[in-house]
Regions:
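Flexible, low-complexity charged segments
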Residues: 1-135
């Protein structure tokens, strides 16, 4: 009976080792986290009578489940930072493609700073504007 148990254990060890190697060989999963609801607010608060409004649909790219959990746990801080950034913009920084790319890069930088402050790692690899409407 003992021999049978030892034999079964011996046969199951290689299977467990192969399964562990498969887990180690897997590439971490890339996740896109959409910050919902979309950002809507005013920008260009320079004293002109015309109200300027933006709507931004933002997604964050992270790798791995731990990074996804960290971003979701800190989403209110990220949203606060992005709302403040969008509100600081002027008509010039929202009106052309190059300026929008600079805004995207600054939003990514600030998001990474929030995550570094909270978790010790930037975690967010990229920030994407799925939609950016200005009026």
């Amino acid at each position: 009976m003992k021999a049978w148990i030892v034999l079964m254990l011996a046969l199951s060890l290689p299977v467990a080792a192969v399964a562990e190697e498969a887990k180690e060989g897997e590439a971490p999963k890339v996740n896109y986290i959409t910050l919902s609801p979309p950002f809507v607010g005013n920008y260009g608060l320079d004293g002109t009578p015309k109200l300027k409004v933006y709507k931004a649909d933002v997604a964050l790219r992270v790798t791995g489940d731990e990074a996804t959990k960290a971003v979701k746990a800190n989403e209110p801080l990220i949203r606060n930072q992005l709302v403040a950034l969008f509100a600081q913009q002027t008509t010039e920084t929202m009106n052309n493609v190059e300026a929008k790319e600079k805004l995207r890069q600054e939003a990514l930088k600030q998001t990474q700073q929030v995550m570094t402050d909270e978790t010790g790692k930037p975690v967010v690899e990229d920030l994407l504007f799925n939609n950016l409407i200005i009026q």
